Amino acid sequence: MHPHSYLNQSDAIALDVELFNYFGVEQLMELAGLSCASAIAEGFPESKNVLIVVGPGNNGGDGLVCARHLKMFGYSPEIFYPKRTAKTLYENLTKQCELFEIPFLTACPTTEGLNSKYSLVVDALFGFSFKAPVRKEFTEIIDNMLHMSTPCCSIDIPSGWDVENGPLDQDNSLKPAMLISLSAPKLCARFFHGIHYLGGRFIAPALATKYKLKLPNYPSTHNCVRL
């Protein structure tokens, strides 16, 4: 176990704004998505048939990047993207996945389909800006994920969780087998007890000091670390 601190929602948003100003969203998203793919490769090396469930915001963008890198790592990813974002960045990320011949599902997979076809489902729906309730475009896929037996890996925040208080309804909240926190763990990670990785190796010492972050050392050239 590596000792680490947590970010509340307001500090997570403020840190992201600073990072965007220094690096730009494209660079950060590429690094974050790569670290997610690397963590999945460490945590689930044999789970080659992966579905990435992509949301409309930055968390979804991380998922698209993650899918592309998983493909290059030898996985067989597929993507379910129920509400596409009409912005150049997301359109380009989608085209990149298509260039790598990653299939996009045209219909919401059933719980039975999630169980029979995939060995891992990556939850890249909502990030730390999420506020309940879940919008109707996403209720079906989240409900199917709630009832699947296939393990789930959530990027940064398990979708539907409160960013600070964790699962609001224990019986109707995702219970991922793995969580990949980005930049720094958010407060809700205190309620997570599975495989926990940290990715996003781009926090400068000055920012760590400003936000009072205690972060683990990344091993060697790795871009993720298990907490």
Swiss-Prot record:
Which residue ranges does the record assign to the YjeF N-terminal domain? Answer: 7-215
- Keyword NADP assigned: yes
Task: State the source organism's domain of life.
Answer: Eukaryota
Catalyzed reaction equations: (6R)-NADHX = (6S)-NADHX; (6R)-NADPHX = (6S)-NADPHX
Q: Which is an annotated GO molecular function term of this record? A: NAD(P)HX epimerase activity
Report the GO terms under cellular component.
mitochondrion
Identify the InterPro entries for this entry.
YjeF_N_dom, YjeF_N_dom_sf, YJEFN_prot_NAXE-like
Cofactor requirement: K(+)
Question: Where do the annotations place (6S)-NADPHX binding?
Answer: N58, N59, G60, G61, D62, G127, F128, S129, F130, K131, A132, P133, D156
Gene3D superfamilies named among the record's database cross-references? YjeF N-terminal domain
Q: What class of enzyme is it?
A: isomerase
Which keywords describe this protein according to UniProt? Isomerase, Metal-binding, NAD, NADP, Nucleotide-binding, Potassium
Q: How is the cofactor bound?
A: Binds 1 potassium ion per subunit.
Family indicated by similarity: Belongs to the NnrE/AIBP family.
Functional summary from the UniProt entry: Catalyzes the epimerization of the S- and R-forms of NAD(P)HX, a damaged form of NAD(P)H that is a result of enzymatic or heat-dependent hydration. This is a prerequisite for the S-specific NAD(P)H-hydrate dehydratase to allow the repair of both epimers of NAD(P)HX.
Q: What is this protein called?
A: NAD(P)H-hydrate epimerase
